[in-house]
Amino acid sequence: AVKSIMESGSKLKGDVILDFVVDEELSGHGTLDTILRGYTADAGICCETSGNAIQPACIGRIWFEILVRGKAAGIQRRYEGVNAIDLGYKIVNAVSELEQKRLKTVKHPLYPKIIDAIPCMIGSMEAGSFPSAFPDTCILKGSLATVPGEDHDAAKQSLLDEVRFAALQDPWMKENPPEVKFTGYYAESAEIDVEHPIVKTVANCY
């Protein structure tokens, strides 16, 4: 689009800045660096994959890590141990249950298909180092998404509550509760008024 404007010789009323940044998937440090360098604009368009749709809202993202403790034991005396992997699966199911609850309660007008907007899932499980022994720890890493207007602290608390409830149903975890921490990627959800001039201008030109 910018190339076409330049080739046409059209004169714009303002400046157009093309900013190519790194770190889009993890933390947005590239965009932050742009701001810290003093670049400002009346409006911006993020060229995120959208199927060429105008998207005036952006979900938030909270990464978390859950440490589940078991009791190590060798294969012959495994009955003396507590398999942290078995416990980990219970917590994985609890996180899945939280997603189902959120699908029924979290709504946003710009996200009619809410299942695409608010994933709550475990994407990584780390446990054990030897095939013939119960591991004493299981580390689960996952992601929780929020919609604009949603309280991030409340969303985090819902995860803590769900994990705690699941742990209370297990005799071992009741006495050895999993440890939840929020670490890594964290981004607040955001949106722009659909009546904002930049949104209406892009819509009218598209």
Q: Where are the regions that the model predicts?
A:
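Metal-dependent amide/peptide-bond hydrolase catalytic core
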Residues: 56, 63-206
